[in-house]
Amino acid sequence: MLANVPRLKALMRKDGFDAVIATCAENVTYLSGFWAMSQWVRRGPQAYVLFPGEGHEPTIIVNSSLLDLVPDQNPWISDIRRYGYFQIDTDRSVQLDAADQLQHQLFSSKAYKNSVDALVGAMKERGIERGTVGIDEMGITPQCMDQLQAALPDIKFVRCFSLFERVRAIKTPREIEILRHAARVTEGAIDAALSIAKEGVTEREMLRRFNAHLVENDAAPVVGCIGFGNRSAMINVQPSDRKLKNGDLIRFDVGGRYRHYRSDMSRGAALGDPGEKIRKYYAAVEKGVLRGYDIIKPGLRVADLFKEIVATVQREGIPHFARSHVGHGIGVDGYDPPNIAASSVDVLEEDMVICVETPYYELGFAGLQVEDMVRVTKDGAESLMSLPTGLRIL
């Protein structure tokens, strides 16, 4: 189980929810361990997890076309409700293995007409026909929400995506283990990409090597911003046929996904001497991140972390440095709470995993960025990284 269920139950009690319903891809996977593929690859497909209060088991609601993923993934929730038609046949002359037996059993179960009918059926079986139910508003379509409210008029449905965010902000030991591995694999991909760095290599060639390393290590590419020279100042640079030249800066702002969890990090390198200004400015953004390690601990106001990191970069060499944020949480989503911004009202808590970053973009010059994945410990900070933060000269 990935989810921090004790925290979920505590927040449900605090907010007065009799049940909560996960509807977006990240929350469905987080709460159940079930990866509803169609939710992740296109907009619109409906999958839900009903999580009642004490005394009732949770339920996964999923389209019949995804039932094969249940034995493949073995989610901790055993009650699976399907909806929609999908035909699959069984060769009755052979002995089915355990996975196929479970598939056959699931395809033999009742098929509801649509996702809302399946959800309503599960709720009524559990006696959830009145009271207050939290619903993650980010995945359910407006039409489905209208149908749900019409079918259960005595329930007060309250938006609760923010509740799921609060739950996900504090990671379990298993989540931290996965995030640590995701970071290691992504660092290896940066090393792999830089191993081919020489004059004439293109940004696209470097991205291909980066992505290949992720796939070879059971991860999937998600973000691959790799830019050379002045193109490194493009905020969301997409690799092109730009060739690497001596003196170029190489900026990585990259990430992948491993076992449903994200990685996000940034590093810089240069082919030969990049010049004094790049060295000076890079050292400033690096010191901003390192200053974060000095002060991160439970109870620190996130807004104060933001202010100290920005002030450090300004003091260390970029006096005009300005940012809307200098990091964010990370987990099943690339941007979990907290958002490290001046406006944040959050405080750091033990076992948050955050990305601390100090990007600087100057058109006509370069983009410089250091970003680390960091766990908040009971008395400080633990880096999930192994690569040095300094500018790497190739």
Locate the predicted segments by residue.
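Active-site neighborhoods and metal-handling regions in enzymes and metal-associated proteins
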Residues: M1-L394
